[in-house]
């Protein structure tokens, strides 16, 4: 029996077009069209490799002979200081994005994310 090579901690970001308009309009979270930076308000972080995106991640995994990956997707969506409705809508979208990654390639990805507890009741 051959052994699986598993990446136990990785990230996948959505394509800029997959991010809801309200999030960019309210400066909650967005990715520049050239996919070089992710942003929240005045904060920005460089996207240092194309392999942070779905199709490119599959190419990267093939290059390094990785069979499966555990993904912490959208780890930058913290919801700090957000209104309740914005946090709820963003987390709902985040959940749907994670489900789409899992649904598209369940043989390659196990997806998860951190839920922010500010508005849990």
Where do the language-model regions lie?
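Helix-coil boundary/capping segments in enzymes
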Residues: 1-121
């Amino acid at each position: 029996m051959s052994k699986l090579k598993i990446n136990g901690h990785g990230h996948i970001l959505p394509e800029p077009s997959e991010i809801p308009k309200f999030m960019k309009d309210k400066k909650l979270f967005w990715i520049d069209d050239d996919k070089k930076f992710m942003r929240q308000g005045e904060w920005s972080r460089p996207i240092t490799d194309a392999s942070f995106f779905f199709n490119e991640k599959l190419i990267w995994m093939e290059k390094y002979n990785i069979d499966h990956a555990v993904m912490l997707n959208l780890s930058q969506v913290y919801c700090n200081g957000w209104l309740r409705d914005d946090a709820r809508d963003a987390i709902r979208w985040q959940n749907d994005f994670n489900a789409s990654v899992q649904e598209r390639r369940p043989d390659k990805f196990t997806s998860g994310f951190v839920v922010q507890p500010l508005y849990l009741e």
